[in-house]
């Protein structure tokens, strides 16, 4: 009798343990079996929709985060040295560049500390690719290069800090009213424009940019922060550039139908899709890709997939940014 009771207890404990295991497994399903969900902790999602970090999960058929859990966060300077930064933006301090002396390595590193996920998400290759993508897109926005420029057109990023041929860019909004005498034209690496964007950005980084928009063109740390704010911030229906380039964004069925897939091309769509995407071959898109490829090569990382947006439907026609290339 005692033996039977003991066997029943062992059997009951075993059943409960199995149920706990099954229940825990169901809580960690991912991929197409779970509506595109990502695994917690950066773990791989296997072809069958389960989370883990071994070859069974991260190997052939892996659906997402296939590099496994991210390494511990590190200072950005461990991924991009001062000398590499100077090589990437080789002619930014050329005498012909109005931004000479403004965009410094130290300002870039200091600004990035306000956004600890930037360059710190995913495996080392993903982190480097994000840095290349950010500098590639912003180099296009501030380029001073031309087809036959010394060292090629993609060595002339960060030549400008202010938009050429600027306008006022003031739209009457009660939440972010234009300050008297101020203009909200494109400034900084991402060429942020319009009063409501200066207002949102200033609120996020703790600076009164509505009343002092020119801080984006006179304080190099604030200037980089403005670009990183845009990069890291989702503005519905657009995801953040950060989430797209690090594959944390899962496209909806509407995105897939619009050919908006994870990759550098969708970042271009976020930034200036209304003018550049869905138009077939476009020299502006090619320019963005040229910078990106050069920077990936210097960082020793692959380009990833979906580099252009030639066949993508734009997210929308409202523009956050003022593109230097189109304003010439």
Curated annotation (Swiss-Prot):
Cellular component, GO annotation:
vacuole
Q: Which first-to-last residue range defines the signal peptide?
A: 1-27
SMART domains (UniProt xref)? ChtBD1
- Expression induction or repression: By ethylene.
Coiled coil location:
none
Per the record, the domain of life is Eukaryota
Can you say where in the cell this protein is located?
A: Vacuole
Instruction: Name the active site residues.
Output: 141
Question: Transmembrane segments in this chain: where?
Answer: none
Q: What class of enzyme is it?
A: hydrolase
Recorded E.C. number(s)? Answer: 3.2.1.14
List the Pfam families hit by this protein, alphabetically: Chitin_bind_1, Glyco_hydro_19
Spell out the residue numbers of the propeptide. 318-328
An example of a GO molecular function for this protein is:
chitin binding
Database matches in Gene3D superfamilies: 1.10.530.10, Endochitinase, domain 2 (3.30.20.10), Endochitinase-like (3.30.60.10)
**Similarity comment: family membership:** Belongs to the glycosyl hydrolase 19 family. Chitinase class I subfamily.
Q: Main role?
A: Defense against chitin-containing fungal pathogens.
What name does this protein carry?
Endochitinase
Originating species = Phaseolus vulgaris (Kidney bean)
The organism that produces this protein has a lineage beginning with: Eukaryota, Viridiplantae, Streptophyta, Embryophyta, Tracheophyta
